[in-house]
Each structure stands twice: as structure tokens, then as C-alpha cells.
Amino acid sequence: MSEARGEPGSGPEAGARFFCTAGRGLEPFVMREVRARLAATQVEYISGKVFFTTCSDLNMLKKLKSAERLFLLIKKQFPLIISSVSKGKIFNEMQRLINEDPGSWLNAISIWKNLLELDAKKEKLSQRDDNQLKRKVGENEIIAKKLKIEQMQKIEENRDCQLEKQIKEETLEQRDFTTKSEKFQEEEFQNDIEKAIDTHNQNDLTFRVSCRCSGTIGKAFTAQEVGKVIGIAIMKHFGWKADLRNPQLEIFIHLNDIYSVVGIPVFRVSLASRAYIKTAGLRSTIAWAMASLADIKAGAFVLDPMCGLGTILLEAAKEWPDVYYVGADVSDSQLLGTWDNLKAAGLEDKIELLKISVIELPLPSESVDIIISDIPFGKKFKLGKDIKSILQEMERVLHVGGTIVLLLSEDHHRRLTDCKESNIPFNSKDSHTDEPGIKKCLNPEEKTGAFKTASTSFEASNHKFLDRMSPFGSLVPVECYKVSLGKTDAFICKYKKSHSSGL
């Protein structure tokens, strides 16, 4: 059931196998994004992870917005069998992750090295192009200066004779310096590439093992114990050196009762960490997922009437820039935080901020194309009348055919459903591995052991929630996804306005 491997030495140009970790419930968004952004194939999933094949380089991989972390896949297989009481036998099972198929490890390391070298070359070429442009500008300035002096010679030939000679000498010196500098940079560029190759030589690698263990194996061993066993096996088999503080390579291993996955983190920083967000509000992956559902088109009027720190608008404006965005809130502190985020992201001229109440929007009826908002959670926010008043005002300003995407708490969502058994969790009949929107991809009892490609399971779960939702006035539910916010769960719900509300 292990992942099929390419020939050893095959690079990313032949398509490499990756996987992303995702917040619970966001797997369908990651799957859509890798297909659309990376032209990914062989897209599969298990709870919390999405696997795919792509030829994309690091620059494109960095652009993923819905995923948490990205890994180059080494191995994916059934869980380890922990039936023996002998720790030695269990440790041998762990070591088989390395010893049983060393080719998959060497192939992954080769692809990882090629990705880094290709990225380094592109970075160097970009810097060299910038330097060449600067040199060209400098040469043009010298030529312009020389022409100006020649014009002055016609009027004051005697006085400027010496100056012309001096400028000619400066020009020759500058050209000589430019030639030497360019030659030096080319040599430096070549040295850096050779150094990169030496640094990533497979025999001289330094590494660290990071483990996550849950289920039966998590009860029997700590992550540190497993990491030590795996680390020793790697050192013996490949001759690499352990370095816990500053390794060249990190090995990630996740072991549980459902699967065993081994990979290499492609980036040290999480994809969900946005450099352009100064103060985080709603998690960026959730905000991007909401915006991706809204069908944003160039020229649209997009409103977030409860914008908080503006995370949803920031994510939307970065991805779909040619749009008129408006953020509103009643809190001065929230709006100040949003403004700081806009300045940090360079989006001050893209998003307009208003201090207004969501139930008294100073906008004409049917004037807004899209509304995206995180409905506030917590004890201070009353259910019932308040949530309905908010939806009524959103319905009023939204034009017919427009879209609303909301993040609703479980209580808010329950209030808007016709589910009579509201005290029963929506996924109560599912096992702990069958999250809403997720169908089991790995069934240990199946002889084939194949990870299934997702096609209809997400849609089936989506319909499961939609069946419990009824239209609110002219707002018709279209999609609904249950997602994790960490300590609590919420629902991303999409509505379409079917007809004039008459308000």
C-alpha cells in the first residue's frame, strides 16, 4: 500500500510527491487549490492531510494559502503493528521505515536537493539581472555626461579640454571596473552553486527527526523515544549526522492507528504564517477559504460588515486585487488594528474602512455584490433576534444573484437549521477519523490498502449539512463546511440571493 516511487534521481521536473497538513475541515479547500494553483494530479486525502503530485517549483509552492505546512513525501503506509510486548520488536518495526525501502529516501533527498538548487539559481539570476540593469543605468549616465561635455567644448574649447580628457579616463576606468566586477560575480555565482551541491551532498547531511505519535503507539512510546530510534536507524543506514539545533534537513514522522507518514518539511515557516499580516485575527487559512468560496470577480463590490482586524479582506485583496473592498466595524480598537494591518500589507488604497453597525448599513438596497464575514462568537453576542437582524440587513444590501459567505458558530448554525435534534452532534454517527467532509481514505481492512482520491465524499457531507439548512428569506444555502478553529468548531456557509427581498 506504500506510495509508488519514481525512478531514483528523478527531479521535480518529472513531478514530485508532496503532502500538506490542513486544519480539520479545510481539506476540500486545499484539494481545490493545489489543482488550480499547482496543476496538481493524483490528489488524495486523509484526515488532516492532502497528498498530490506537481512539477511546481518552490516559488509556486510558497503561494499556497489554504494549507498549514508543506512536506516532500518520503513514505506513506499502513500503521505500525504494536501487538508485541517486546519493545525491541516494536523498535525493529520502526526501523523498517528506513531499512525496508532506502531508495524512496534517496529519491526524496535528490528531489529536495534539486528544488533548493533550482531556487538558488533563480535567486542568483534575478540578482544578476538587477545588477546588470544597475550597470546599464550607470553606463548611460556616463555617456550622457560625456555628450554634455562635448557640447560645452564647442563654446569653451580651451577651458574644457582637460575636463574632457578626465571624463574619458573615468569612462575607461568605469568600463574596466564593470568588466572585472561582472567576471567576479559570475565566478561567485558558480562558487555558490558548487557550494550548494557540497552542502547538500547526501553523505554529509545533518538532520533532525520530529515525531507526532497518537493512538496505540502514542500510549506506548513518547515522541522523543520514537525520534531517537528513527534517528539512530538513519545514522546507521545513510551515515548522516544528527544536529538538533541547526540541521540542514528535518525528517517529519506521524504515526497513529490509521497510517504512518514520513516527509521532509519544504519550508521552515508555516505556509499559514503571513508576512503581510501584522496582527492576526481570524486564522489566515480560514479567511482565505471563505474568500475562495465567494466567487470574487474583478470590479466587484465586496463588503465585510464585521471586519474585526480585517483578515478576510486582507486575504481577499491579496488574491483578487482589482476589487472594491469595504470593511466595517463598530469598534475603534478593531478598526485601528485593521488600519495597521492594511499599512503593513501595503493595501491602504485597496480597502476602505467605515465605523458603522452591521444592522444599520448606510448602503442602498441591492448595492453589494459579495458579503464575507465572521459572525462574532461568545456569550456577549445574543442568539436569535440578533443573528436574524444581521442577516436581514445583509440580505437588504445584497443584490439578486449576489453571494454571502459567513463563518458561524455551532450555535448560530443550529439556529439557522431545521434540525430538531440540535443537541446531537452532526457527526455523531461517524468514527473519530471520519470528520465532517472527510471520508476515510485508508481502510486497514482493505486488501488493496489504497488511499482513495476524493471525488464525491466532500460533496456528500456538504449536502448533509445543507439538508439541515433552510433558506433565510431570499438567501438560499449553497455550500456548508464544518471546520476546526482549535478549541471549537464552526461552519463556513455560503448563500445566494435568489430574488428581491422586498425590504
UniProtKB/Swiss-Prot annotation:
Molecular functions per Gene Ontology: RNA binding; tRNA (guanine) methyltransferase activity; U6 snRNA (guanine-N(2))-methyltransferase activity
UniProt catalytic activity: guanosine in U6 snRNA + S-adenosyl-L-methionine = N(2)-methylguanosine in U6 snRNA + S-adenosyl-L-homocysteine + H(+)
Superkingdom assignment: Eukaryota
Domain THUMP: 161-266
PROSITE patterns: THUMP (PS51165)
Keywords attached to this entry: Methyltransferase, Nucleus, RNA-binding, Transferase
Cellular compartment(s): Nucleus
Listed EC numbers: 2.1.1.-
UniProt KW Methyltransferase keyword: yes
One cellular component (GO) term of this entry: nucleus
Pfam families with a match to the protein in the record: THUMP (PF02926), UPF0020 (PF01170)
InterPro entries the UniProt entry points to: RlmKL-like_Mtase, SAM-dependent_MTases_sf, THUMP_dom
GO biological process, one term: regulation of alternative mRNA splicing, via spliceosome
Tissue expression remark: Expressed in a variety of tissues including brain, colon, gingiva, heart, kidney, liver, lung, placenta, small intestine, spleen and thymus.
Family that this chain belongs to: Belongs to the methyltransferase superfamily.
Self-association and partners: Part of the heterodimeric THUMPD2-TRM112 methyltransferase complex; this complex forms an active tRNA methyltransferase, where TRMT112 acts as an activator of the catalytic subunit THUMPD2.
Function: Catalytic subunit of the THUMPD2-TRM112 methyltransferase complex, that specifically mediates the S-adenosyl-L-methionine-dependent N(2)-methylation of guanosine nucleotides, most probably at position 72 (m2G72), in the U6snRNA of the major spliceosome. This modification in the U6 snRNA affects the constitutive splicing efficiency of introns that have suboptimal splice sites and can impact final mRNA levels.
PANTHER family: THUMP DOMAIN-CONTAINING, THUMP DOMAIN-CONTAINING PROTEIN 2
Protein name per its UniProtKB record: U6 snRNA (guanine-N(2))-methyltransferase THUMPD2
Organism: Homo sapiens
Top-level taxonomy: Eukaryota, Metazoa, Chordata, Craniata, Vertebrata
Gene that encodes it: THUMPD2
